[in-house]
């Protein structure tokens, strides 16, 4: 008897209010870290009806022109007309950034050159063989749809689209393997002139059928395109946006646990971000090496402490090696101190704006060092000893 179930993940476009906030926070981080690699940055952004507020804590000698940075991000996303609910030229930009507490900094920057964790916390990484990039299929497909929504809007293939949008994909699994798409939900902001019928047909033909892998498509997929019937008011005019509210979209679509820490606006001394990247790096290399088909990795840290307080590996009964053996391998092959992660993944670079929409994982860009599988041979060698 087949074990059959549905699993669902969602994604949002770069014009979604929460993603706007993430992108502004990461643009501020990139501006500062490009000029000061020793900077400590924790940047939070709020976008709402007609205004943007940037807040958080910094420790840097760099002056960051917050207004210019925020307006450029909003312009690039496509909020270039007040009719869209937000305009980069007329929106107010407020700066409420303060200085980082010296109580925090004393535990992070150490005289011996090591770096203590910027906070306590637990972070997860995940990898599986459902896609070429070793990501779960539902979140992979959901990101493809939202990315295509933005591209078709920007290249004028579908000129009636506006920046805000979301996707959701339900995948049918049989015996723990994806076999088909069951349901697709797409909600996209649009101009008031376009009819619901034309919008639905265009989105299905120009996006779904041109983007998604044909082996998962079939005639009985259930489509819900703008199921409320109209989505003209969107972006920050429709909903306030905040940094760090799309942590499941940013990661694995719910396929593995999440420690709760957001990524955007945080420099890599914050293990919420850097250790989550390291956990993905570990999980992906374990799967790429062939020692397992699926891996969930948990790392945990204490503020000011160099070494992780725990390392956990779960291969979901897909490995002949025990968790204890795999954890021993991980500790031998990977550098999991904050400094070790930063150096091995080369994280002191202005790369974070690239991460802030369409997922931090599963996109094999040159800048995404945590997506490399260059440790797979070392893992194989460890188990041959």
From Swiss-Prot:
Superkingdom classification of source: Bacteria
EC number: 2.5.1.6
Subcellular location: Cytoplasm
UniProt catalytic activity: L-methionine + ATP + H2O = S-adenosyl-L-methionine + phosphate + diphosphate
Cofactors required: Mg(2+); K(+)
Residues reported to bind Mg(2+): 18
Pathway(s) annotated for this protein in UniProt: Amino-acid biosynthesis; S-adenosyl-L-methionine biosynthesis; S-adenosyl-L-methionine from L-methionine: step 1/1
Residue positions binding K(+): 44
GO biological process: one-carbon metabolic process; S-adenosylmethionine biosynthetic process
PANTHER family in alphabetical order: S-ADENOSYLMETHIONINE SYNTHETASE
Function of the molecule: Catalyzes the formation of S-adenosylmethionine (AdoMet) from methionine and ATP. The overall synthetic reaction is composed of two sequential steps, AdoMet formation and the subsequent tripolyphosphate hydrolysis which occurs prior to release of AdoMet from the enzyme.
Protein name in UniProt: S-adenosylmethionine synthase
Higher taxonomy: Bacteria, Pseudomonadati, Campylobacterota, Epsilonproteobacteria, Campylobacterales
Gene: metK
């Amino acid at each position: 008897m087949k074990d059959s179930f549905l699993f669902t993940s969602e994604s949002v476009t770069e014009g979604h209010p929460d993603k706007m906030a993430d992108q502004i926070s990461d643009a501020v981080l990139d501006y500062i870290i490009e000029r000061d690699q020793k900077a400590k940055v924790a940047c939070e952004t709020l976008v709402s009806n007609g205004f943007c507020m940037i807040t958080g804590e910094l420790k840097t000698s760099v002056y960051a022109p917050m207004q210019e940075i925020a307006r450029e991000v909003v312009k690039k996303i496509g909020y270039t007309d007040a009719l869209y609910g937000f305009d980069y030229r007329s929106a107010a930009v407020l700066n409420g950034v303060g200085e980082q507490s010296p109580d925090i900094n004393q535990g992070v920057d150490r005289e011996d050159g090591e770096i203590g964790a910027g906070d306590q916390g637990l972070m997860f990484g995940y990898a599986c063989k459902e896609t070429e990039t070793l990501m779960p299929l539902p979140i992979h497909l959901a990101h493809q749809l939202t990315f295509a929504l933005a591209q078709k809007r920007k290249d004028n293939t579908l000129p009636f689209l506006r920046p805000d949008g979301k996707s959701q994909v339900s995948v049918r699994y049989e015996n723990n393997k994806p076999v088909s798409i069951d349901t697709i939900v797409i909600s996209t902001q649009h101009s008031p002139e376009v009819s619901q019928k034309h919008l639905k047909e265009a989105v299905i033909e120009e996006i779904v059928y041109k983007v998604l892998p044909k082996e998962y498509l079939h005639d009985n997929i259930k489509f819900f395109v703008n199921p409320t019937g109209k989505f003209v008011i969107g972006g920050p005019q429709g909903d306030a946006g905040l940094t760090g509210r799309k942590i499941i979209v940013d990661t694995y679509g719910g396929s593995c646990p999440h420690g709760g820490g957001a990524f955007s606006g945080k420099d890599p001394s914050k293990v919420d971000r850097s250790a989550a990247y390291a956990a993905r790096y570990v999980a992906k290399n374990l799967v790429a090496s062939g020692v397992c088909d699926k891996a969930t990795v948990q790392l945990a840290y204490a503020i000011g402490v160099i070494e992780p307080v725990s390392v956990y590996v779960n291969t979901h009964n897909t490995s002949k090696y025990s968790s204890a053996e795999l954890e021993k391998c991980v500790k031998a092959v990977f550098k999991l101190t904050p400094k070790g992660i930063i150096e091995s993944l080369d994280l002191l670079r202005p790369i974070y704006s690239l991460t802030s929409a369409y997922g931090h994982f599963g996109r094999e860009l040159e800048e995404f060092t945590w997506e490399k599988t260059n440790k797979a041979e070392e893992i194989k060698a460890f188990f041959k000893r």
